[in-house]
UniProtKB/Swiss-Prot annotation:
Interacts with the spanin inner membrane subunit. Part of the spanin complex which spans the entire periplasmic space. The spanin complex is composed of spanin inner membrane subunit and spanin outer membrane subunit. GO terms for cellular component: host cell plasma membrane; membrane. Component of the spanin complex that disrupts the host outer membrane and participates in cell lysis during virus exit. The spanin complex conducts the final step in host lysis by disrupting the outer membrane after holin and endolysin action have permeabilized the inner membrane and degraded the host peptidoglycans. Host outer membrane disruption is possibly due to local fusion between the inner and outer membrane performed by the spanin complex. This is Spanin, outer lipoprotein subunit. It comes from Escherichia phage Mu. Residues 91-105 have a biased composition (Basic and acidic residues). Keywords: Cytolysis, Host cell lysis by virus, Host cell outer membrane, Host membrane, Lipoprotein, Membrane, Palmitate, Signal, Viral release from host cell. The keyword Metal-binding does not apply.
Amino acid sequence: MMQKKKLQPPLLVTIAALVLCLPLLLTGCGNSKNAPVPSVVILPEIDTELTEATPVPPMPQPLTWGASLLWNADLLMALGQCNRDKASVREQEIRRKEIYERRPEPGGGAAAR
């Protein structure tokens, strides 16, 4: 017959410590919650020259038929500049949407689809 080997006391203490501590280590993080990380959104700046006020040509004094004709031409040029500025803002908005539509969703939203 084979004799059972007796474990030495330091080995028994080590095994007992492992048996007592391992369940605590395995269940210690079971109730922890992951805090959501806020996403940082940096919006692109719109050019300041596009948001500046368009100068309005002053009304000539005295307002004659000839001066009125020149003033209307100046007003139409100012209106044209406003329309070009608005078109540039629309182009920048389209570019911004294209950039931010390509970004991954925060929190791994692509995996949930």
